[in-house]
């Protein structure tokens, strides 16, 4: 079975081709991605209308490129998958519209996919895919969650952010320091030259006893420190960046280790854009190695939003019998779509 996946939830247009054979793990045949970062930099953030228009310009050329790279024709596609939500409404509608139009033109079914499930299952595209069950740290610009994952569609929420996500903490703190958009990668790069112990910043909910997160207070503390530094901010910017990153990473690390201890599982999956952060990876790898825990990540270029994860999630759902592709082309999107709606709380846990 050949699946085309289309991602257009925010500021990346992604298209990919995944192939399945029976119950074997789906294989990525080709993918293409266009980032809108350069376009949005002038505005200091994503402009939804511009994002939608750019998706319209990019999605069909990317589809043609993906098919050419794989040496396949559109007629060979069996299912067209697309990001149904969550995300920017206009951006989602572009991908959904193109997917449904392609499906109707080819006489092939379509399947809407949850964006976060795409991230969650993206490590299965790596050379070292995980095995169920595992603890998942889903950490991105808009979401921070810890889950127990016993199989496709068998998710138990262990904890989540009660305010800002970790990615927001990176991006908003970077903006307070005057760093360019997107702030997270710039802050991480600057932090390499700084002292992570230079400023004492809060680690919200670090000792709360549960697995929830909170990063709004950290953002406020960074703002307070930046104002306090005043004209000295530029000279101390690397130290402030390093201290901010250290606070975020410590919380993610300690909560992840607590989740592993609580579940007794020995596998951790880290997915989402923040999963590309080098400091987070290094500290998780070191701490988990001491505990005999295997850590799995997506390939670095697949940490960001991409079509491969959408095609993969669709393929794995179809293989698991949890979804049926539809030839009903009257689509709808879900800009707000809680991951909890996919969680089968009644499913019995799988032994580690």
Swiss-Prot record:
Molecular function per GO: iron ion binding; N(6)-L-threonylcarbamoyladenine synthase activity
The cofactors required by this protein are:
Fe(2+)
Q: Which residues bind substrate?
A: 138-142, 171, 184, 277
Main EC class of this protein?
transferase
Q: Record's Gene Ontology CC terms? A: cytoplasm
Where Fe cation is bound, by residue?
115, 119, 305
Listed Gene3D superfamilies: 3.30.420.40
Q: Pfam families this protein is in?
A: TsaD
The cofactor binding remark recorded in the entry reads: Binds 1 Fe(2+) ion per subunit.
Report the EC code(s) recorded for this entry.
Answer: 2.3.1.234
Q: Which reaction does it catalyse?
A: L-threonylcarbamoyladenylate + adenosine(37) in tRNA = N(6)-L-threonylcarbamoyladenosine(37) in tRNA + AMP + H(+)
Q: Which UniProt keywords apply?
A: Acyltransferase, Cytoplasm, Iron, Metal-binding, Transferase, tRNA processing
Q: Where in the cell is it found?
A: Cytoplasm
NCBIfam families associated with the record: gcp_kae1, T6A_TsaD_YgjD
Q: What does this protein do?
A: Required for the formation of a threonylcarbamoyl group on adenosine at position 37 (t(6)A37) in tRNAs that read codons beginning with adenine. Is involved in the transfer of the threonylcarbamoyl moiety of threonylcarbamoyl-AMP (TC-AMP) to the N6 group of A37, together with TsaE and TsaB. TsaD likely plays a direct catalytic role in this reaction.
Recorded hits in HAMAP family, A to Z, give: TsaD
Q: Which family does it belong to?
A: Belongs to the KAE1 / TsaD family.
Q: Which PANTHER family match?
A: TRNA N6-ADENOSINE THREONYLCARBAMOYLTRANSFERASE, TRNA N6-ADENOSINE THREONYLCARBAMOYLTRANSFERASE, MITOCHONDRIAL
Mind telling me what this protein is named?
Answer: tRNA N6-adenosine threonylcarbamoyltransferase
Protein species of origin: Variovorax paradoxus (strain S110)
| Taxonomic path | Bacteria, Pseudomonadati, Pseudomonadota, Betaproteobacteria, Burkholderiales
Designated gene of the protein: tsaD
């Amino acid at each position: 079975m050949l699946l085309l996946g289309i991602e257009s939830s925010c500021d990346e247009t992604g298209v990919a081709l995944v192939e399945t054979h029976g119950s074997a793990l789906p294989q990525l045949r080709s993918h293409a991605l266009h980032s809108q970062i350069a376009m949005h930099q002038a505005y200091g953030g994503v402009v939804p209308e511009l994002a939608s228009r750019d998706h319209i310009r990019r999605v069909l050329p990317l589809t043609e490129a993906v098919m050419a790279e794989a040496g396949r024709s559109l007629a060979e596609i069996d299912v067209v998958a697309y990001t149904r939500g969550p995300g920017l409404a206009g951006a989602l509608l572009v991908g959904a519209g193109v997917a449904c139009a392609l499906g109707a033109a080819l006489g092939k079914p379509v399947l809407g996919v949850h964006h976060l499930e795409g991230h969650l299952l993206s490590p299965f595209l790596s050379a070292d895919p995980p095995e169920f069950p595992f603890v998942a740290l889903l950490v991105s610009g808009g979401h921070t969650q810890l889950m127990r994952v016993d199989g496709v569609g068998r998710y138990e929420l262990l904890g989540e952010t009660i305010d800002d996500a970790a990615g927001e903490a990176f991006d908003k703190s970077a903006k307070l320091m005057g760093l360019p958009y997107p702030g997270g990668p710039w802050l991480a790069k600057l932090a390499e030259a700084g002292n992570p112990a230079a400023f004492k910043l809060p680690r919200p909910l670090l000792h709360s006893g549960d697995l929830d997160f909170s990063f709004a207070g950290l953002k406020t503390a960074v703002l307070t420190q930046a104002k306090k530094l005043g004209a000295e901010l530029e000279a101390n910017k690397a130290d402030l960046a390093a201290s901010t990153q250290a606070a975020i990473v410590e919380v993610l690390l300690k909560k992840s280790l607590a989740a592993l201890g609580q579940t007794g599982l020995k596998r951790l999956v880290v997915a989402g854009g923040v999963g590309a952060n080098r400091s987070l990876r290094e500290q998780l790898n070191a701490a988990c190695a001491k505990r005999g825990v295997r850590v799995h990540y997506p390939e670095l270029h697949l940490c960001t939003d991409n079509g491969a994860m959408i095609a993969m999630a669709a393929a794995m759902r179809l293989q698991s019998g949890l979804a049926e592709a539809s030839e009903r082309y009257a689509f709808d999107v879900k800009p707000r779509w809680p991951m909890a709606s996919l969680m089968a709380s009644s499913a019995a846990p799988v032994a580690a």
